[in-house]
Amino acid sequence: MAETRILVGPERFTVGTEYDWLAERDEDGAVVTFTGKVRNHNLGDSVKALTLEHYPGMTEKSLAAIVAEARGRWPLGRVTVIHRIGEMWPGEEIVFVGVTSAHRGSAFAAGEFIMDYLKTKAPFWKREATPEGDRWVESRDSDKQAASRW
C-alpha cells in the first residue's frame, strides 16, 4: 500500500526516525533519501541564519501534487517530504525527501524529481541573515534547468 507523509513546520526532524518509517515495508527493496542543510555561506558571503516562509495550505497542497505526479511516473511505496519553516542556523536540516520502491532506479529518479520540483514549484521563500544584513534568496537558473528535464 502506498503511503505519503508531508510535514511543513518549524520542528526539527531526525533523519534516522524518518528512515526507519520508510524502511519498514518488506516489499520495497530500495530506500532513497535526501537531506538538505543550512550552509554557512552563499554567493561568497557568510550566512548566520536562514529564515523560510511559506504559504500555509497552498504549500502542502503543492507538495502533495508533486508527490502525486511522482507516483504517476514511478511505482512507489512510501514517500516522505518534510520541509522546515522559520529561522534556522547553519548545520541544521531544512528538508527531507524519502522515497521507497521495489527497485533503486524508480526510487532514485522519484527522489530527484520530487526535490527538483519542490525547489521550483512549491511556494517557499528564503531570507538569509549575513553580516551585511538580510537578503531574499532568488531562485537559481540551475534549479529551473534541473526541473525542466522532467
Regions found by a protein language model. Name each.
Residues 1-94, 102, 106-112, 116-150:
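N-terminal, polar/charged subdomain of small-to-medium soluble alpha/beta proteins
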